[in-house]
Amino acid sequence: MSAAIAALAASYGSGSGSESDSDSEGSRCPLPAADSLMHLTKSPSAKLSLTVAVDSAPEVAVKEDLETGVHLDPAVKEVQYNPTYETMFAPEFGPENPFRTQQMAAPRNMLSGYAEPAHINDFMFEQQRRTFATYGYALDPSLDNHQVSAKYIGSVEEAEKNQGLTVFETGQKKTEKRKKFKENDASNIDGFLGPWAKYVDEKDVAKPSEEEQKELDEITAKRQKKGKQEEEKPGEEKTILHVKEMYDYQGRSYLHIPQDVGVNLRSSVPPEKCYLPKKQIHVWSGHTKGVSAVRLFPLSGHLLLSCSMDCKIKLWEVYGDRRCLRTFIGHSKAVRDICFNTAGTQFLSAAYDRYLKLWDTETGQCISRFTNRKVPYCVKFNPDEDKQNLFVAGMSDKKIVQWDIRSGEIVQEYDRHLGAVNTIVFVDENRRFVSTSDDKSLRVWEWDIPVDFKYIAEPSMHSMPAVTLSPNGKWLACQSMDNQILIFGAQNRFRLNKKKIFKGHMVAGYACQVDFSPDMSYVISGDGNGKLNIWDWKTTKLYSRFKAHDKVCIGAVWHPHETSKVITCGWDGLIKLWD
């Protein structure tokens, strides 16, 4: 286009070379008007302007902006796109659960952990199992034997020797016959052995003479004497009074129920309304090891008895200065359980030194001791007034033994359990008692009849090492080892109440005590993480949970006359009062 314009301009220029030519030759074509060529010339006023804007902070696509909405929900099982490795294994977003324990934090798809689906051929599994039982080796199941050369576990040398043969293969190696000395020449009368020849690897054992036998008998007798364990003698019982005077100015001991504490401790009527405890108001410290159990004084609850793994039993004040009144010393091993009689004047203690001891609460004197050479796990007085001389103890040899304090002898044995007996609770106006055991069963007994008339054992049941009777006597709260509290009826049929199951705490492996509030509105229990859990009785909802002890919170007792006072004990050696 530009070349055509240039040629046109040149043709116009050649025609206007001189004025004479233009004048002489009038017949030439006239010049075009200037307006007609305006579109071919460059306008001097038109200028090309380039505007450049300088921005010191340009917009940049941030990586976080691009990744919004890409976070995966850890609960989702299927993903509709292909996420990156970083996206799939990024840490979880959102607030952290403050009550999440170490067991709960681990990924799992079932209650006890994470189970991966796997398929094992029954024949191949049985083949390897029998091979291992017969020859002592089997293929390593953790390796893919199709891709890796076969590796064995167990006796690898035997596997190489047999070339990996299994019990189902016909070419297995036959055991070598034992070789005998050969001398089959019958003409050799003195040296002929025949079928009576000895084996090559046979060893001759000479019978000791009479003198040697006597020496051997003496040596074995000495060894037996050394090996015999000396029978554990009961430890020397003593008591320490920690207050200056045992009696006040009126001659009353600390067993006297106080009347100036703001609560009627002699009343048999429970408080109308109970409330949740919220703060710690006192700590009793005196035990050097974990506290096993705490028991309140019968009816009034103005005294507290505690037993510990430091082999000591201590009596504390609940009101006033809350002092330690007396220490009872007499067991050589950890004390497992304690129990007051109905009046509170005496109490029993059961310890791992295989002794049950009867103590006087006021003087601290050890009245008598009982043992059948087995470890007692629990002990209970018969609550009836006319049977205060009888008590029962659950033993480690699967028996419940009944003793008479007056004679010191065993008067009855209940031996139907298949495991160590953990708890004994009297029900139905003390005519019957309920026992639980390591055999995961619950049995109900008539008093003094050694045959259980009710046996409860479901396949889904776990061991229940702590059982408590409700204040109204209608329900049994059982601490089950599958982290829940089960409620059984305690009057007629002893049925499981499936509407009342309390969950949310971690007690697997610990016999944490359960208790009720006096008005039956709350259920309390410690747990393995040292927390105190409080549930609502009607709705089974977990109302409150707070840290009570640094170690396992093994015991929790609600004061029978207070609206919100709870006493807890733990394996940190402390006893705490909450209100």
Curated annotation (Swiss-Prot):
PTM characteristics: Undergoes isomerization of the peptide bond between Gly-94 and Pro-95. The reaction is catalyzed by PPIL1.
Keyword annotations: mRNA processing, mRNA splicing, Nucleus, Repeat, Spliceosome, WD repeat
Listed GO CC annotations: nuclear speck; U2-type catalytic step 2 spliceosome
Pfam family, one: WD40
Keyword Repeat: yes
Keyword Magnesium: no
SMART domains (alphabetical): WD40
Ranges occupied by WD repeats: 286-326, 330-369, 371-413, 416-455, 459-498, 504-545, 548-578
Domain of life: Eukaryota
Gene Ontology terms describing biological process: embryonic brain development; mRNA splicing, via spliceosome
Region (Disordered): 1-34, 204-237
Protein name (Swiss-Prot/TrEMBL): Pre-mRNA-processing factor 17
Source organism (scientific name): Mus musculus (Mouse)
